[in-house]
């Protein structure tokens, strides 16, 4: 299918052209492009968009307990079966009292968290007070909703402490927003939920909560090929957020599953077998 220019004839002289024939000669020199050979162009766009989607994976989690909010994440970035990085920072500091997590497209998550941080700072300057966790999550949800259906890939948690205490919200790229006491997002979330749900108690100490978060991330990286690297754990309390630990999941494996030393009988049996 070629672009038809037969309807461009006109009796009015055009600025920059001596006559209508000059304009047609100029148009005829412009290269023509084939149009998509499909009757349903909307369907064609959808198929083309699906072809551009890459498999992604991660594990992030957050939960509320009596001491505040515990946030943890792995650090692996992947595209399908290719591991592009083992040191991605998936917990973003929005302000000294609020954190955001990354799951989905790295560029989308980083951009919208930076954007949210700017808007939270402007709110603080204009109103002489910090924005609430609820307000920040609603602001992010509204921004993402305005780009709904345009190919964004964002699954984030907004965790923080404000005048009402700890707050935790989940926000996705469709503008959805959920409030809860514990969430896990990413391809490794089913494995993290298995550990998190079985060990969660509201009245945990900070040490117990950090250990639960670390163990949940480790087990997710052990079973999910798209998660790995370093398990980072943050705590958000009345004084703001603090990074508690960042442990290589390979070393955590031997912490949770120590290798039992061989007994003398086993050593003798192996030597005899050789």
UniProtKB/Swiss-Prot annotation:
Task: Indicate the residues that form the catalytic site.
Answer: 58
Main enzyme class: hydrolase
Q: PROSITE patterns of this UniProt entry?
A: PROTEASOME_BETA_1, PROTEASOME_BETA_2
Name of the molecule in the record = Proteasome subunit beta type-5-A
Instruction: Name the InterPro entries for this protein.
Output: Ntn_hydrolases_N, Pept_T1A_subB, Proteasome_bsu_CS, Proteasome_sua/b, Proteasome_suB-type
The UniProt subunit note reads as follows: Component of the 20S core complex of the 26S proteasome. The 26S proteasome is composed of a core protease (CP), known as the 20S proteasome, capped at one or both ends by the 19S regulatory particle (RP/PA700). The 20S proteasome core is composed of 28 subunits that are arranged in four stacked rings, resulting in a barrel-shaped structure. The two end rings are each formed by seven alpha subunits, and the two central rings are each formed by seven beta subunits. The catalytic chamber with the active sites is on the inside of the barrel.
Q: Which gene encodes it?
A: PBE1
Q: Which residues form the propeptide?
A: 1-57
Is Cytoplasm given among the entry's keywords? yes
Alphabetical list of Pfam families matching this protein: Proteasome
- Which terms does the record give in the GO molecular function aspect? threonine-type endopeptidase activity
Q: What is its main location?
A: cytoplasm
Q: Which family does it belong to?
A: Belongs to the peptidase T1B family.
């Amino acid at each position: 299918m070629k672009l038809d220019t037969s309807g461009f004839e006109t009796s009015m002289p055009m600025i920059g052209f001596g006559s209508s024939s000059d304009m047609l000669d100029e148009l005829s020199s412009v290269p023509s492009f084939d149009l998509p050979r499909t009757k349903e162009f909307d369907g064609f766009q959808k198929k083309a968009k699906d072809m551009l989607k890459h498999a992604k994976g991660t594990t992030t989690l957050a939960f509320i307990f009596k001491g505040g909010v515990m946030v943890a994440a792995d650090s692996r970035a992947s595209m399908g079966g290719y591991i592009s990085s083992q040191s991605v920072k998936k917990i973003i500091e929005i302000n000294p009292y609020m954190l955001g997590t990354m799951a989905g497209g790295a560029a989308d998550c980083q951009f919208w968290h930076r954007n949210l941080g700017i808007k939270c700072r402007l709110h603080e300057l204009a109103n002489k007070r910090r924005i609430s966790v609820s307000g920040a999550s609603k602001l992010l949800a509204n921004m993402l909703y305005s780009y709904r259906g345009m190919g964004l890939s964002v699954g984030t948690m907004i965790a923080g402490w404000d005048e009402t205490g700890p707050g935790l919200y989940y926000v996705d790229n469709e503008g959805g927003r959920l409030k809860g006491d514990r969430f896990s997002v990413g391809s490794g979330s089913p494995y993290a939920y298995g550990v998190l749900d079985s060990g969660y108690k509201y009245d945990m100490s900070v040490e117990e909560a950090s250990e639960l978060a670390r163990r949940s991330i480790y087990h997710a990286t052990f079973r999910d090929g798209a998660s790995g690297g370093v398990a980072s754990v943050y705590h958000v309390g009345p004084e703001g957020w603090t990074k508690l630990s960042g442990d290589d999941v390979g070393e955590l494996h031997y912490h949770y599953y120590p290798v039992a030393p061989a007994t003398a009988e086993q050593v003798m049996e192996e030597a005899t077998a050789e």
